[in-house]
């Protein structure tokens, strides 16, 4: 299980990404249409003034149950350990153990 502080930090990042996402998109759209070098620098400065944790690339996929980042399955939102245990307990409908 991940530390609670790490999970809270990740949730804070998600809130910041949601809060500043629209503003970031507007600045990026303006960057595509601007022709002046000075205006471009001003827009880049605005983009850099946004909080560092508001960038979507700083988000990590985490298991919603344990908070683990490694071995994450996007389809389920779970780490491999939890996915295996839940599949064995028949808590995931449609998931069948493979055999060949």
UniProtKB/Swiss-Prot annotation:
GO biological process: translation
Superkingdom of origin organism: Eukaryota
Any one Gene Ontology cellular component term annotated for this protein: small ribosomal subunit
Main location: plastid
Localization terms from the record: Plastid, Chloroplast
Pfam family, one: Ribosomal_S14
Protein family (similarity comment): Belongs to the universal ribosomal protein uS14 family.
Summary of subunit composition and partner proteins: Part of the 30S ribosomal subunit.
Protein name, per record: Small ribosomal subunit protein uS14c
Source organism: Rhodomonas salina
Lineage, opening ranks: Eukaryota, Cryptophyceae, Pyrenomonadales, Pyrenomonadaceae, Rhodomonas
GN (gene name): rps14
């Amino acid at each position: 299980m991940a530390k609670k502080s790490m999970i809270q930090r990740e949730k804070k990042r998600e809130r910041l990404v949601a809060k500043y996402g629209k503003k970031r998109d507007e600045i990026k759209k303006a960057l595509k249409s601007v022709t002046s070098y000075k205006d471009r620098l001003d827009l880049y400065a605005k983009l850099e003034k946004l909080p560092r944790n508001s960038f979507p690339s700083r988000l990590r996929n985490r298991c919603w149950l344990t908070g683990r980042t490694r071995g994450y399955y996007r389809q389920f939102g779970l780490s491999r350990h939890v996915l295996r245990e839940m599949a064995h307990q028949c808590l995931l409908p449609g998931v069948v153990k493979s055999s060949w």
